[in-house]
């Protein structure tokens, strides 16, 4: 199922992070959140019953590249106070996916009516943060130029398992000229809490990707003859893991539709 197309009225383009969340809550923004609240960290989401929370936290600790945890809710709570004022996990993301027994059964605008007292929400760092640093350095982002979602692919790179959780890493791809790819490695290495440096450059078949024109998530992008594909670990990995591990119930964000936080990208830079 594809995420809804971006709907962003012109008067939303300069909203604060809090105002952008409220606009999502009101249904005024759907689809991708790329470019909203510039300078603020956006987060992927995974929500699981509390009996699975410890195992998932251990899974994330063992796999920090695809699953860098930046916030965890208390059981039943729809807020993660350290991530934002008046932040509601169940309503403030423009697209959610509902999973039952490893199957994605529904995509919806909010999950307030599905929330339970035993659910724990995990906010996971998102590559939109390091994309902002790449743009500031003058590096091109093809998916932004084309107005589409970044392409994402399941790979043959195994995640380290924990309890019932395991499965393949998902990566996002950005085509760059070789010199720009080297610079991208330098820039994104500063942001380990939001996936950090790439996990692979070139040769997509070496990590199990057969056709770059057919991403598993997101949208395909043009790749120039003088460019190479550069792959970063991706926060959609929990969705691949949920499909493989088949928990009875889970909620995630829809790919490209993120939780906009009050935290600044600069807070997550290490140098």
From Swiss-Prot:
**What's a single GO MF annotation on this record?**
lyase activity
Per UniProt, the keywords (alphabetical) are: Lyase
Highest taxon above the source species: Bacteria
Q: Which residues form the signal peptide?
A: none
Keyword rRNA-binding applies: no
Q: Name the Enzyme Commission number(s) assigned to this protein.
A: 4.2.1.-
Give any Pfam family that matches: D-Glu_cyclase
Claim: Lyase is one of the keywords in the record: yes
Q: Which family does it belong to?
A: Belongs to the D-glutamate cyclase family.
HAMAP family found in the cross-reference section = Hydro_lyase (MF_01830)
Protein name, please?
Answer: Putative hydro-lyase Mnod_1097
């Amino acid at each position: 199922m594809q995420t809804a197309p971006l709907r962003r009225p012109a008067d939303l383009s300069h909203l604060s992070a809090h105002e952008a969340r409220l606009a999502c809550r009101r249904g005024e923004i759907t689809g991708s959140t790329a470019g909203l609240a510039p300078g603020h960290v956006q987060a992927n989401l995974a929500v699981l019953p509390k009996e699975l929370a410890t195992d998932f936290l251990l899974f994330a600790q063992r796999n920090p590249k695809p699953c860098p945890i930046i916030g965890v809710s208390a059981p039943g709570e729809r807020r993660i106070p350290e991530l934002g004022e008046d932040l509601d996990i169940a309503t403030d993301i423009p697209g959610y996916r509902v999973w039952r027994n490893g199957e994605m059964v529904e995509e919806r605008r909010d999950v307030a009516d599905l929330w339970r007292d035993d659910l724990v929400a995990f906010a996971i760092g998102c590559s939109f943060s390091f994309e902002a640093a790449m743009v500031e350095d003058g590096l091109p982002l093809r998916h932004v130029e084309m107005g589409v979602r970044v392409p994402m692919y399941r790979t043959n790179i195994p995640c380290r398992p924990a309890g019932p959780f395991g499965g393949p890493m998902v990566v996002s791809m950005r085509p760059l000229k070789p010199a720009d790819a080297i610079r991208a490695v330098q820039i994104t290495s500063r942001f380990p809490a939001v996936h950090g440096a790439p996990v692979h450059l070139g040769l997509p078949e070496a990590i199990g990707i057969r056709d770059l024109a057919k991403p598993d998530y997101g949208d395909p992008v043009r790749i120039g003859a003088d460019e190479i594909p550069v792959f970063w670990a991706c926060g959609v990995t929990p969705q691949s893991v949920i499909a493989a591990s088949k928990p009875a119930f889970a909620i995630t964000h829809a790919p490209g539709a993120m939780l906009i936080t009050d935290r600044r990208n600069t807070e997550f830079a290490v140098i």
